[in-house]
């Protein structure tokens, strides 16, 4: 490590080694490791009065393209109001030690990640972004104001970023790429490594994801948000009783009339109401809805089937035959790197 520091550091960009060999076993994990590094970065930026400084979250087994820092600096300079941004990523599909079984497994898991975000955007949710801990950046002042990284052993990135994204003006950096390891792992209960390991243990590259009809149901609700703001409390029930059955059942359990009325009372205009509504119906609540509907109304689909349905919903699918999962992932990657414009309007 010391040799690496001697070789990596250069004028204007020193490299520091932080050693914490005695982490408490109960807390030791990726969340605590990420928190230690990001807390130290925030403290250094605070000491030189740079709250707008950038903290980048990365993983030791990932690698980046040479233009990463340049793209980060350019993006944050051009968007002074952005609190943070996700960086475009791809899992390595070839390379030393990556067999066909791992390749087929990671294709499906990455396709699942991209499908979920893009389906949520199709539904109209404003907080739909990738939230991988290995590929995001946040301003130091925002990091501190949101309480810093948590100590979760898995999902720490998702929970932290879904405190930042609702602040508004969250961004995406697609002019570079962070390349992620597809290795199987049993260190965490979910995530890339756990997903690959699960498929390898099952003996087949098969990954089930949420049925696309559940996102169509959400779209029916989210499309009505402006109408909910304009309506009187007495008519809210009529509006949501015209929605799909899975949505009606879920909203009935959540006292939806009272929620909408509270959002309306505390909103000066439609934009304010919309922000309040989606802070309530945040991505955590979306996942709760999806899990509930797949207990009663829908069965999960193999991810390639769901992804194809999403692509075909607007008539933009460019191949005249049934694609492989790898072909679908290539199309999703291409669309995502162009800023989500080529498939989802």
Task: Show the residue positions of the predicted features.
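Acidic donor-binding segment of Leloir-type glycosyltransferases
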Residues: 1-26
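A recurrent flexible, glycine/aromatic-enriched loop bordering the glycosyltransferase active site
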Residues: 117-137
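Catalytic donor-sugar/metal-binding loop of nucleotide-sugar-dependent glycosyltransferases
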Residues: 152, 164-179
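Acidic donor-binding loop at a coil-to-helix junction in glycosyltransferase catalytic cores
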Residues: 152-159
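Active-site donor/metal-binding and catalytic loop motifs
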Residues: 173-194
């Amino acid at each position: 490590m010391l040799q690496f520091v001697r070789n990596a550091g250069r004028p204007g960009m020193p490299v520091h080694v932080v050693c914490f060999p005695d982490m408490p076993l109960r807390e030791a994990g990726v969340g605590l490791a990420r928190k230690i590094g990001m807390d130290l970065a925030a403290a250094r930026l605070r000491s030189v009065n740079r709250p707008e400084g950038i903290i980048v979250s990365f993983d030791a087994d990932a690698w980046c393209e040479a233009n990463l820092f340049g793209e980060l600096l350019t993006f944050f300079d051009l968007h002074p109001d952005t609190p943070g941004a996700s960086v475009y990523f791809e899992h390595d599909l070839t390379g030393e030690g990556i067999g066909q079984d791992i390749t087929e497994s990671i294709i499906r898991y990455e396709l699942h990640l991209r499908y979920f975000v893009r389906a949520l955007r199709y539904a109209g949710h404003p907080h739909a972004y990738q939230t991988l801990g290995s590929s995001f950046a946040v301003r130091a002042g925002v990091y501190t104001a949101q309480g810093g990284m948590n100590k979760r052993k898995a999902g720490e990135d998702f929970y932290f970023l879904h405190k930042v994204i609702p602040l508004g003006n969250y961004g995406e950096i697609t002019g570079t790429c962070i390349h992620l390891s597809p290795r199987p792992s049993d260190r965490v209960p979910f995530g890339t490594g756990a997903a690959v390991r699960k498929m390898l243990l099952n003996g087949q590259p098969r990954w089930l994801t949420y049925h696309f009809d559940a996102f169509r149901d959400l779209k029916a609700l989210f499309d009505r948000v402006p109408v909910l703001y304009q309506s009187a409390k007495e008519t809210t029930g009529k509006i949501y009783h015209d929605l799909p059955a899975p949505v009606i059942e879920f909203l009935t359990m959540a006292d939806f009339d009272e929620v909408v009325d509270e959002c309306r009372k505390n909103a000066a205009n439609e934009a304010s109401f919309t922000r309040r509504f989606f802070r309530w119906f945040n991505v955590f609540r979306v996942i709760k809805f999806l899990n509930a509907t797949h207990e009663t109304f829908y069965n999960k689909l193999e991810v390639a089937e769901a992804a194809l349905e999403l692509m075909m919903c607007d008539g933009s699918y460019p191949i005249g035959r049934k694609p492989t999962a790898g072909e679908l992932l290539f199309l999703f990657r291409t669309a995502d790197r162009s800023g989500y414009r080529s498939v989802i309007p």
